[in-house]
Amino acid sequence: MVKTNLFSDVASVEQYIATYPVANALYNSFRPDWKILVQDFFLSKRTLPLTYDPFFKRIFNADTHPDRLSRLISSILGQEVTVTEILSNEDTLLKGSSLLIMDIVVRLANGSITTVEIQKLSAAFPAERMSRYSADLLLRQYEQVKNRLKKHFNYSSINKVYTIVIFENTDSETTNVPVYQAFHAEPVADKYLHHGKITFDTGLNLEFLQEFYLISLDVFREVGYAKDDKELTAWLSLLATNTYEDASLLCQKYPWMNEIFEEISEYIHNPEEVVRMFSEALKMMDDNMYQYMADQHMALVKEQQGKIDNLCTLLIEQMKENNKSKEDAVKNLVAACDLSYDNAKELVDKNW
């Protein structure tokens, strides 16, 4: 494995980047923690963060390396598949409120559609969102097949859709989140790959079209390294690897990975591309973080508003029982619930 040692310290890295004006302007706009990631890459301390969209799509580019993505997906699904097409994900119905850091949609040789997503935190991508995402993919395929076959269309022409979600971290700050509780329940706490599909408790044998594969990279880091020689272990190790020391050990175990890490090392000679990819990753992360925080805030506001509405309803009932007039009830609500006169009157009229 190639490990370059072109730079001795941060100052020499920044002097090098400064010779590329576009890269330097982007680099200087980064937060300190992201500057450190860039510095560590050029100092050969860290590899590129492959869980982030621009880096993943560069290393798993289907045009230049058609086998890599096929092998990764095959190892997850447990069956050999071939990626034949990268599909646009711009029209996906699922936007915002999740900490998405990588997203790719592909068509397999048998016509199936597979999405591979990497989420920063499991709490931001609950089962309801996964269900919606899978339904989106199924509807997308249905419309494509129906438009292609027209009057010859039948439902047997629709292939499976596989939703693969890789969680960079399933350990949330709040352990009462349902997704956290699911991943860390006692029977599955040491499992990093979870496969799900629709089954019947009677054993009725019907094959439905939606399947889910959920992977916890943080759990894999704890229990998965060096446990076996399966290809899935190799690919997940690649995604979980951050340092050149770990990368070197990985290449010793899987010599075919030398090519990948040599390609990563070569980017040291292309600082504009490296900084641009970091910039894209940072923007995607920040945009999704802001949206996630806004959605969390709105959910809290909605919850608090519900509590206020319930309190106001109880107060109105009490005033009705005490034979208060509607006008008195409105004035009391204004004082007790900090409402405007019009809002208080609307609540009284609604519940009187």
Residue ranges and their predicted role:
Residues 1-211:
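Accessory alpha/beta interaction modules
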Residues 2-46, 114-119, 237-352:
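Short, charged alpha-helical interaction segments and adjacent helix-coil junctions
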Residues 203-206, 219-220, 251, 255:
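Polybasic (Lys/Arg-rich)
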Residues 214:
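Alpha-helical segment proximal to the catalytic Tyr-Lys
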Residues 234:
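A conserved mid-domain beta-alpha-beta active-site/ligand-binding segment of alpha/beta enzyme cores
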